[in-house]
C-alpha cells in the first residue's frame, strides 16, 4: 500500500494540486543544505540504510573464527503533521483561487528546518553528524559584519592549505545573512565585497544554521541520501477537518570533515 494514502483523503484533485504547490514553493525557496552537498536518491520508502563499507569486529565468536558485522547508516523517517479545513478545500472545486493553506506552509518550513538542521548541526539520535560539529578546523570569530571579508578570506585560506579545493560557498544563518546584506563599507555593499573578493561560489541563506560556514563545493565531501523525497500524505479526517503530513526519509554523511570552516557570529 502507498504509505502516503492520498487516495483515501476527501480532497479534490485541484485542492491537492494547490497543497502540493504551496509546499513546493517553500521547499524550493528555503531548503539550503541539499543545494550544497551531494544528493543521492530518491530511492523510495523501501530504501532503509546506506552501506558504509565498514566492518565492526564481533568479540564473542567460536574459537578460530573471525567474525565482523557490516555497518550501515539507517535512514530517518520524518513526518510533520498539519490540519486543514474540509470546507476550505472543497471551495477549490467551486473555483476558489486563494484557499487558506498557511498550515501547509508552516509544516513545510518545519520539515526544511529538520533536514537542514541535520545537515549543518547533526542529529545524534538518528546517527547523523553535522558539518559544523565534524570539522577539525578551529571556528573563526566574526565580531562585526565588517569582519566578514577578512574571516571568509581566512577560512578559504585554511581550506586551501588543507588541500581542500574550491569552489567555496558562503552559507549564512538568518542573522548573519540579514546583517551582511544590510551592511555597507565606504558606500559599497559588504556582501558584494565578500562575493567579489573571497568567494567563487554562491552565498546561501540557511535558516537552520547558527553563524556561517565557508565550505567546498568540489563534491565528494558531504552526502545527503534520500529514500522518500519530500511528499504530502493523508492521516485521517472527520466531518470538518483533515489531517495531512509532510514526509521524508533521509540520512546525511560527512565523508571529509575538513571541507568546511565554521564562522561564529552572534
Swiss-Prot record:
Signal peptide: none annotated. GO terms for cellular component: encapsulin nanocompartment. Its main location: other. It comes from the Bacteria. One of its GO terms (biological process) is iron ion transport. It is found in: Encapsulin nanocompartment. Pfam families: Linocin_M18. Keywords: Encapsulin nanocompartment, Ion transport, Iron, Iron storage, Iron transport, Transport. PANTHER family: PEPTIDASE U56 FAMILY, TYPE 1 ENCAPSULIN SHELL PROTEIN. Shell component of a type 1 encapsulin nanocompartment. Assembles into proteinaceous shells about 21 nm in diameter. Small pores form at, or close to, the 2-, 3-, and 5-fold symmetry axes. Data analysis suggests the 5-fold pores open and close with maximal and minimal aperatures of 15 and 5 Angstroms. Cargo protein Fer (ferritin-like protein, probably stores iron) is targeted to the interior via its C-terminal extension; empty intact shells can be isolated in the absence of cargo protein. This encapsulin nanocompartment is formed by 60 subunits; monomers form 12 pentamers which assemble to form shells. Shells are loaded with 4 encapsulated ferritin-like protein decamers (EncFtn) in a tetrahedral arrangement. A 3 nm gap is consistently seen between the shell and the cargo. Belongs to the encapsulin family. Family 1 subfamily. This is Type 1 encapsulin shell protein. The lineage of its organism: Bacteria, Pseudomonadati, Myxococcota, Polyangia, Haliangiales.
Amino acid at each position: 500500500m502507498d504509505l502516503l494514502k492520498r487516495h483515501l483523503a476527501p480532497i479534490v484533485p485541484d485542492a491537492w494540486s494547490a497543497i502540493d504547490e504551496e509546499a513546493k514553493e517553500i521547499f524550493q525557496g528555503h531548503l539550503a543544505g541539499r543545494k550544497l552537498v551531494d544528493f543521492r536518491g530518491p530511492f523510495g520508502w523501501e530504501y532503509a540504510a546506506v552501506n558504509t563499507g565498514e566492518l565492526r569486529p564481533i568479540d564473542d565468536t567460536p574459537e578460530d573464527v573471525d567474525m565482523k558485522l557490516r555497518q550501515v547508516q539507517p535512514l530517518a523517517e520524518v513526518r510533520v503533521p498539519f490540519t486543514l479545513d474540509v470546507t476550505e478545500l472543497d471551495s477549490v472545486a467551486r473555483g476558489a483561487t486563494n484557499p487558506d493553506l498557511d498550515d501547509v506552509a508552516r509544516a513545510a518550513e518545519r520539515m526544511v528546518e529538520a533536514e537542514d538542521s541535520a545537515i549543518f548541526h547533526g542529529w545524534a539520535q538518528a546517527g547523523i553528524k553535522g558539518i559544523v560539529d565534524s570539522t577539525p578546523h578551529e571556528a573563526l570569530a566574526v565580531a562585526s559584519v565588517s569582519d566578514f571579508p577578512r574571516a571568509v578570506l581566512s577560512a578559504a585560506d585554511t581550506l586551501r592549505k588543507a588541500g581542500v579545493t574550491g569552489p567555496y560557498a558562503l552559507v549564512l544563518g538568518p542573522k548573519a545573512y540579514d546583517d551582511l546584506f544590510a551592511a555597507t563599507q565606504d558606500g559599497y555593499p559588504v556582501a558584494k565585497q565578500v562575493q567579489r573578493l573571497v568567494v567563487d561560489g554562491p552565498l546561501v541563506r540557511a535558516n537552520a544554521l547558527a553563524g556561517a560556514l565557508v565550505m567546498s563545493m568540489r563534491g565528494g565531501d558531504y552526502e545527503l541520501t534520500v529514500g522518500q523525497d519530500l511528499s504530502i500524505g493523508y492521516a485521517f479526517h472527520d466531518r470538518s477537518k483533515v489531517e495531512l503530513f509532510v514526509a521524508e526519509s533521509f540520512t546525511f554523511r560527512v565523508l571529509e570533515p575538513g571541507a568546511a570552516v565554521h564562522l561564529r557570529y552572534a
